[in-house]
Regions:
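N-terminal Rossmann NAD(P)H-binding glycine-rich loop of SDR-like oxidoreductase domains
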Residues: 3-23
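NAD(P)H-binding glycine-rich loop region in Rossmannoid oxidoreductase-like domains
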Residues: 45-91, 95, 99-102, 119
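Conserved Rossmann-fold NAD(P)-dependent oxidoreductase catalytic core, especially the SDR/UDP-sugar
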Residues: 94-138
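Substrate-positioning beta->alpha
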Residues: 95, 145, 174-180, 194-217, ...
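Active-site Tyr-X1-5-Lys
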Residues: 134-162
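Glycine-rich Rossmann NAD(P)(H)-binding loop
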Residues: 171, 193-198, 226-233, 244-248, ...
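Conserved C-terminal active-site "lid" loop/helix of NAD(P)H-dependent oxidoreductases
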Residues: 205, 238, 264-295, 306
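Mid/C-terminal beta-alpha module of Rossmann-like enzyme folds, strongest
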Residues: 214, 218-272, 305-308, 318-322
Length: 322
């Protein structure tokens, strides 16, 4: 089997390429810049909307995993964020899908986002695949539009489409907010998060690529949407404590009423960030379990341990070399 992976040099892409190679798959990697990759072949495509860029990379491919995207940012400085997200996440995705269908690709696996469902849930009322979508920012809107257009292409061309909506992904090499959290824990910064009673679904990158691999080949995955997580939800407090344990340090957490945290965040212009940190977001992965027979192969504890150990090791190396 020959699989094309866009975003092959990214955080998830590197893990996926490694897994597929272990499974004996021929992997064609694609990225916007030419880099060294574990893929059997790697192509640089600076503009994914270029209709002439895909003939060679798609040649002979049985399936395609589309990871590349314009990712969500907390404070987008562009004049028209939705237009920029649509350019990459909708228009370029559809160009790729049409080229893939013309090239004879049988299945297109699209990595979307749980943000298509919405930003928060009530405890014990997780998101499901058949819930009404509720995208609330430009990134989520663009992902939802891409999903709908891909399903239309599937009907028109016969190319199968699989959509996966992950929540926050962590793992070795993770950056952004998760890395900031690990940094705060490692260096013993006091955090007012000692009694946050929320529940959130997270996703270890190893579990995500496991589901992607399953969706590439399972007959029942065709033209389906799947939500995915580690299968065990934790509070923000529990997450920080687990990271501290894996780092070999004690979490310096103290309790502050959530209302006070929210009021302070509003004054500092951090309301949205705190809502995401302290709010609930749970997903139900029953469909992937029941339809595909898939189970997350890696526990939350083991996933966090691998993530933190890599983070601590990288920081130690930086300190040695500085």
């Amino acid at each position: 089997m020959k699989i094309l992976v866009t975003g092959a040099s990214g955080f998830v892409g590197q893990h996926l390429v490694k897994l597929l190679k272990q499974q004996g798959v021929c992997v064609v990697g694609v990225g916007r810049k030419l880099i060294t990759s574990d893929a059997d072949m790697f192509f640089s495509v600076p503009d994914f909307a270029d209709i002439n860029a895909w003939q060679k990379p798609l040649e002979g491919c049985d399936a395609l995993v589309h990871l590349a995207a314009r990712v969500h940012v907390m404070q987008d400085k562009t004049v028209n964020p939705l237009a920029e997200f649509r350019k990459v996440n909708v228009d370029a995705t559809l160009n790729l899908a049409k080229n893939a269908a013309q090239a004879g690709v049988k299945r297109f696996v699209f990595i979307s986002s749980i943000k298509v469902n919405g930003e928060r849930t009530e405890i014990a009322k997780p998101f499901t695949e058949d819930a009404v979508v509720n995208p609330q920012d430009a990134y989520a809107v663009s992902k939802n539009e891409a999903e709908q257009c891909l399903l239309q292409i599937a009907q028109q061309t016969g190319m199968e489409v699989v959509i996966i909506r992950p929540p926050l992904i962590y793992g070795a090499g993770v950056k952004a907010n998760f890395a900031s959290m690990m940094r705060a824990v490692k260096y013993g910064l006091p955090l007012p998060l000692g009694n946050i009673q929320n529940k959130r679904s997270f996703l270890y990158v190893g579990n995500l690529v496991s589901l992607i691999a399953k969706c590439i080949e399972h007959p029942k995955a065709a033209n389906q949407v799947f939500l995915v997580s580690d299968g065990y939800d934790v509070s923000t407090t529990e997450l920080l404590q687990a990271c501290a344990k894996a780092s070999g340090v004690k979490a310096r957490l103290f309790s502050v009423p959530l209302k006070l945290i929210e009021m302070t965040a509003a004054i500092l212009g951090k309301r949205v960030a705190v809502q995401r940190l302290c709010g609930n977001l749970q997903v139900d992965i029953s469909k992937a379990r029941n339809l595909l027979g898939w189970e997350p192969p890696i526990s939350v504890e083991d996933g966090l341990k691998a993530t933190v150990l890599r983070f601590v090791g990288d920081k130690d190396l930086q300190e040695i070399n500085s």
